């Protein structure tokens, strides 16, 4: 059985990472490494993949550099509408929320919903009420954030634990300046997030097109080598006129990060002692 491992992404962008000042890129790499380390700590202790992906994503949600949780971008009306999803590969249990603004860590809300059972997908104040009632922590709204303050995207994490179980988590503030009420692919199981017994996937990019192409599910179902499957289905997004990226991991331990039309922030760790992080094409990639 392959050793435990974690793979995360901090969003795909056409130009943000390559044009960002050095201090921003350094901070981003530091944040990615911290998220990877948080997930790795869970796996080292023998914890489940679900706990590992939630721990990793919560670090990114707490980092204002990334477009999730604390760093979530605003709609065209200046409101905050956060989305997140979580899926357990071993059981096919999942939970997703969208359009929330009162949760400090939306992915923690998803975990509490997943553990509680039905419903699996909730929106807005009803999702908030459900998650807060299950013990999720509320956030303080510090007021409007300039729409141009972030250009990077969604965050996500995948993990394989010592028992061979996979999990996937995705969290986002969505598209900067989006129409209020708009929901992208991140909380849509099978489009932006997926995990089964064989594969886990988390996506980032032009959400409407990832929904149309059901990217996460198609990558998971593919019998092609993982990198080829990722390239094929990101190619479908490109054919539809969009850009984006994804991270994917199989139960055999193979993993990949891929992007079309830009760059994707990524980091990874395996119990075999392999780890790394990167933002640009010339930076390290997981293999």
Report the location of each language-model feature.
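Alpha/propeptide regions of enzymes that mature by internal proteolysis
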Residues: 1-287
